[in-house]
Structure formats: structure tokens, C-alpha cells
Amino acid sequence: MINVLVFPCGSEIGLEVHNALKYDKHINLVGLSSVSSHGRVVYKNYIEGISFITSDTFMEELNKIIEDNNIDVLIPAYDDVILYLSERRDELKCKLATSNKTTCDIARSKRKTYEVLQGEWYIPETFKVSQITEKDLPLFAKPDIGQGSQGIMRIEKMEDLNLLKGKDDEYIISELLPGQEYTVDCFTNRKGELVVASMRMRKRIKTGISVNSVIVELPAEVKQIADAINEKIVFDGVWFFQVKLDRNGHYKLLEMAPRVAGSMSTSRVRGFNYILNTVYQLMGYDIKAIDNLLDY
């Protein structure tokens, strides 16, 4: 039996992890939350009341829970928690289900992501406030570090830039991408090989999560992006990235993350369980995938 701890278990990520692992007879799931959450409804084994990650006692409390419950693998289920724990992996009393600290640090910042992949054709053009002229408009601004579509804005006229003056370090201002948005769910094995890349259309989005998602065929252009990112950045197990079509019909990268996506179930039901295989990989198994020719 593999004892798996999920924190915070009440996030959309934590709920998808529960759905992905709850029927596996080799997995014993334990949900952990700092505050009362929906995790208490779905996790049979549920622990509540651990301090926030900003507390000086958090790691001590976490390791006690890990030891008391004989936890083998911890799955972080929130972006800030992922980065925090990746920086303290050596202090943890169990395995951590995410990529290395460098990858987590890059992924948490859209600016760092674009800098690492600078020069690639799929990186959108970005601007500083002082460089923007009327002919560049419309543009799009989003926080460098953020989630859930919080703080985004479309820049239609020069006056809109007044809200962003002095905030070049806080925001990414890029070309406007007017086309359809997609998520590509990926898995990288221990050899660094991209095993799976499954693309889905984000038809309806609520607080940054696709609540209506449809599998689509992976275009050659997007497969090139997946391979290029996987070649430049080191992943271990599950990860995903998001792309959007530009005005010329080419795919441009929005962001990436070394974790389960909230709507990854759409790809999971085709036959490849991303987080389950990540757990097995952490436990020493070599992971392969067989193409599922399901007519979606």
C-alpha cells in the first residue's frame, strides 16, 4: 500500500487528485487542509488545522503528520505550496510529487518562463509600458505571478496604460491573442522523455479553470512546443502547459505548471492517469503509454 498525502486537499487540484486516485487498490489517500474545505466531504481520511505555509512551525507540523500516517508521497495541490515544498524537499520526510526546485521556480513566474524559452517562435511578443505606442494596441496584461485569471486586463487605448505605470516587474504585457485557448496535459518519464501529450479545448473558463473541456487532436505545431519545452526544462511526471492562437493562427505559450491541472480528468478518462503514474514513477516504476484510439 502506498500512503499518499494531498495538500491542500480542498483545491480544484486536490479534488482532481482524489478522483484520479480514489479507486486504485494500491493507494491509501489522506487529505490535509489548513482550513475547513470541501476536502472533508470527499476524503475518507481527512486532517484539518495545519498552519499555513507562512508559519514558522509549518514544516515541523507537516513532518509530524507524515510520520504519524506513514506517508510515502506528498502531492502539493496549489501553486504556492508547490514552490514552497520544492524549496524544502530535503526537509520532507517523504517523496514529493512535483518536479525539481528550478522547474517549479521557473513555472511560478510567467516572466521567468518566457526568459528561459526566449527566442522560441511560440513565445508571444512582450512589451514594457514605456515602449508601447498606439500602433501596438490592443495588448493584454496579466500578473507575472498569479492564478485564476485574477488581475488580467485588455489594453485598448493608451490611457489604459496609466494603471500599469511603474508595474513592469509585476505584470507581463504581451500581444493580444484573440484565438481559442487550449491546455496540453503532459507526462515525462524518469529518462526525460515526453510520454504523453493530450490536448483539450478550454471551451468555458471559470476563475482560471476550464469547466467545459473537450479533447482535440494534437496539431504538429503544438507537439513541437511540447517537445521543445520538455527539452529545455526538466520535468518529473505530470505537468501541463496552455496555448492560445494568435491573429495569424499560430499557437503561443501562455504558461506551464509542474502539477495536475484542475480539469485533467478530460484527458485522464482516455486511459492515462497522470498523477497515478507520477506516484508509481516516484516509487521506482518505469512508465510507458499505449496510444488510445478512442474516437473522441
List each model region and its residues:
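Short, charged, surface-exposed secondary-structure boundary motifs
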Residues: 40-42, 58-60, 105-112, 151, ...
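Protein kinase-like catalytic core scaffold
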Residues: 139, 195, 252-255
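A short glycine-rich, hydrophobically flanked beta-strand micro-motif that places a catalytic Asp/Glu
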Residues: 236-248
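ATP-dependent carboxylate/phosphate-activation module, predominantly the ATP-grasp catalytic core
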Residues: 169, 174-234, 245, 257-284
